[in-house]
């Protein structure tokens, strides 16, 4: 209880913690939850509050925490080193704040983490390779920050069959070829500065469902790329992709597709769902033609 009261004091006794009365059982307080058997605090989830303060370092003294969230609470400063003491943590949600500094490399020490959400902050620097040390990680959300450099090569070690990677709206420049060994379920690296070829991320034996690489500087020939049948959403708009759309796209049950604003040529393959999309899916290419675009000459 003393740790919780220290946290409350560090947060300037916000109204959302009005139930935190030391005369009552802390397991009945809002924001926290306790294990039914041990009565130890295992959950701290604070949302939708305009606190405008750093994350209290005392949070690291809640050593049995499994879930920790300061979500949309306007937290400031850097992510505190104290979080590295939370060895039981499996869920970390610090999205929608004003956190600064780097993505901490010490997060790679928290081996039970399955989810890291740091989206919508002001984090800078490169993505730490230490995150690949997390054997259970299934979701990594670092979108809407100011991250730079390459996606770490060590991300090829992620083995979770349902891996979700959100890195959009940053300033990343490279996806290493070794990531072709990783089987992403969902990858979004849109609105970065990534160039070159990313076709190695696809393949008929992959299980990728959603892939968004829009608004980058990708340059590769798409003609012979094999897309997996699991693919339902593909967005490649606003790049420098060349070649013809592969016939294999007709065998995929796509829900959404966007290849506009590239340098594609040739006839749009006929069949599957490719003619069910409107012309905006394909427009502003070099010489792409055929339904739903004008007939090829």
Feature-to-residue mapping (PLM):
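Leucine-rich solenoid repeat scaffolds
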Residues: 247-297
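The feature encodes a structural signal of leucine-rich repeats
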Residues: 55-57, 79-81, 103-105, 124-129, ...
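LRR N-terminal entry segment and analogous cap-like coil->beta motifs
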Residues: 37-78, 82
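Surface-exposed cap/linker segments adjacent to membranes
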Residues: 1-31
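Right-handed parallel beta-helix
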Residues: 71-119
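Consensus "Asn ladder" position of solenoid repeat domains
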Residues: 49, 73, 94-97, 118-121, ...
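Solenoidal tandem-repeat scaffolds enriched in leucines and small polar residues
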Residues: 98-201
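Leucine-rich repeat
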Residues: 38, 60-65, 84-89, 108-113, ...
């Amino acid at each position: 209880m003393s740790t919780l009261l220290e946290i409350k004091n560090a947060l300037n006794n916000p109204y959302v913690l009005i139930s935190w009365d030391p005369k009552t059982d802390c397991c009945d307080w809002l924001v926290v939850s306790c294990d039914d058997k041990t009565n130890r605090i295992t959950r701290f989830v604070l949302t939708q509050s305009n606190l405008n303060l750093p994350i209290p370092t005392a949070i690291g003294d809640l050593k049995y925490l499994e879930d920790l969230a300061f979500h949309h609470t306007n937290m400031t400063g850097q992510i505190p080193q104290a979080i590295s003491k939370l060895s039981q943590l499996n869920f970390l949600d610090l999205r929608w704040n004003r956190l600064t500094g780097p993505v901490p490399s010490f997060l790679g020490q928290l081996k039970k983490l399955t989810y890291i959400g740091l989206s919508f902050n002001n984090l800078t620097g490169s993505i730490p390779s230490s995150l690949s040390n997390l054997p259970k990680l299934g979701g990594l959300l670092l979108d809407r920050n100011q991250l730079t450099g390459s996606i770490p090569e060590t991300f090829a070690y992620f083995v979770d069959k349902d891996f979700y990677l959100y890195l959009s709206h940053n300033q990343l420049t490279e996806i290493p070829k070794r990531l072709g060994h990783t089987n992403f379920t969902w990858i979004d690296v849109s609105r970065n500065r990534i160039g070159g070829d990313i076709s190695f991320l696809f393949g008929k034996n992959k299980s990728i469902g959603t892939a968004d690489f829009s608004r980058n500087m990708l340059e590769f020939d798409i003609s012979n790329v094999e897309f997996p049948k699991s693919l339902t959403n593909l967005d490649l708009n606003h790049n420098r992709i060349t070649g013809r759309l592969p016939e294999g796209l007709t065998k995929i049950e796509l829900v959404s597709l966007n290849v506009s604003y590239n340098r594609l040529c040739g006839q749009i393959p006929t069949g599957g769902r490719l003619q069910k999309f409107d012309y905006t899916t394909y427009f502003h290419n070099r010489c792409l033609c055929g339904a739903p675009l004008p007939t090829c000459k």
